[in-house]
Amino acid sequence: MLMPYRRARYDILLLSLVSFSFFLLLQAAPVFPDPDSFYHTKIAMLMREQGIVKNFPWLQMTVLNSVFADQHLLYHLLLIPFLSLGLPPIWGVKLATAFFAWLAI
């Protein structure tokens, strides 16, 4: 018979595994549900290769044309380890999404 605190640990571990598996299942489609995901993926890949992105010339028709600011800098930094796992970029971001969702609970 397990002691109550050991039982609680197993329950937490089981809940963690089930919830992470559920979040992975939600990411199972081979597409991104939102087109912004491609932007975030590419910025994180550029940051991995070149460092902090200070110029982004592909935004000619936006207010960010003359002065680019990465409004999601920390998110892009958090994506870099997942994009460095050797998986295709789309799967690295999907794994990161499931991991961040799991951390939120």
Predicted region positions:
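Mature N-terminal segment immediately following signal peptide/propeptide cleavage
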Residues: 42
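Membrane-interface starts of transmembrane alpha-helices
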Residues: 11-15, 88-96
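Start-transfer (signal-anchor) and selected internal transmembrane alpha helices
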Residues: 1-25
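Helix-to-loop transition at the C-terminal end of transmembrane segments
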Residues: 24-39
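Extracytosolic helix-loop segments that constitute the early lumenal/periplasmic catalytic or substrate-binding loops
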Residues: 45-66, 74
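Short hydrophobic/aromatic helix or loop-helix immediately within or flanking a transmembrane segment
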Residues: 62-88
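Transmembrane-helix motifs of polytopic, lipid-linked glycan transferases
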Residues: 95-105
